[in-house]
A protein has these predicted regions:
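Active-site diphosphate/adenylate-binding microenvironment
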Residues: 8-94
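Conserved internal helical-beta-strand scaffold that buttresses enzyme catalytic cores
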Residues: 6, 13, 247-250
């Protein structure tokens, strides 16, 4: 049974791959899954990969092809933004290995002061910043649940991302910006050096995280419609606004 299950998983993986050729289009920013595909080719079995909350925590478990000897460390239960930066310090010190935290731009700046420790100890940490100029995960949630209304998640509505090159310079850390997939070899070059670096990857500001749970009509039941389920009548009566009822009535 276990053997047939393993074979089935391998077949599904080949039949429905996470990465497809459409992700190579970087005309509107780099696709995050294309970033992971490059890391799959660049990292070796001595690297420890880490993820933070948000988009990285969703895409990395499905998009990274871990090699023998590699580890993927995350904090899925807490989903705490900014966790990966200080956690990577502990992992680097304890393991003595190259650590590759994959962090969103919003999460990265919540614990940015920890770069002082990274710089002081010259830790071999390669920070991969998925820079989509905002809180992409929060923006996607707001868009799906609240008819496209987005607040406090992008520059147009009260959110600001700092100049990461200036931040890196201030802490004396190497900085590399990646704006096109053709620049991906610059990431590979950074892995040749035993030093910290901030690799700032300009990603798409609009991107769905796939796969995700949804109804056949493409909608998601909102957070107001959770198990144990209330009737449609009660939801309509108790709501202060006109909430969508998209759950199947069957």
């Amino acid at each position: 049974m276990a053997r047939s299950w393993t074979k089935a998983c391998a077949r599904w993986k080949d039949q429905w791959p996470v990465f497809n050729e459409d992700y190579l289009d970087d005309s509107n920013g780099i696709n995050m899954y294309a970033v992971l595909e490059h890391l799959n080719k660049t990292t070796n079995d001595n690297h420890i990969l880490m993820t933070d909350a948000g988009s990285g925590s969703y895409i990395c478990p499905v998009g990274l092809n871990l090699k023998s000897g590699q580890r993927l460390i995350s904090s899925p239960s807490q989903a705490d933004m900014g966790w990966a930066l200080p956690a990577s310090i502990g992992v680097a010190v304890e393991s003595g290995r190259c650590v590759v935290p994959i962090i969103g731009d919003g999460s990265f700046m919540t614990n940015i002061q920890e770069l002082a420790t990274v710089s002081y100890h010259n830790l071999n940490i390669k920070f991969i910043i998925l820079n989509n100029n905002g809180y992409l995960s929060i923006k996607n949630t707001q868009s799906k649940y609240f008819d496209g209304r987005v607040y406090g998640a992008e520059c147009e509505n009260g959110f600001r991302i700092p100049d990461f090159e200036g931040i890196a310079s201030g802490f004396g850390i190497e900085y590399q910006k990646i704006e096109k997939l053709s620049d991906s070899d610059l990431i590979s070059e950074q892995f040749l050096h035993n030093r910290p670096v901030i690799i700032d990857i300009v990603c798409r500001t609009e991107q769905e995280i796939l796969p995700y749970q949804a109804l056949k009509n493409g909608q998601q039941a909102g957070p107001h419609d959770m198990a144990p389920f209330l009737s449609e009548k009660i939801i309509k009566e108790e709501a202060f606004v006109d909430l969508p009822y998209v759950r199947s009535k069957e």
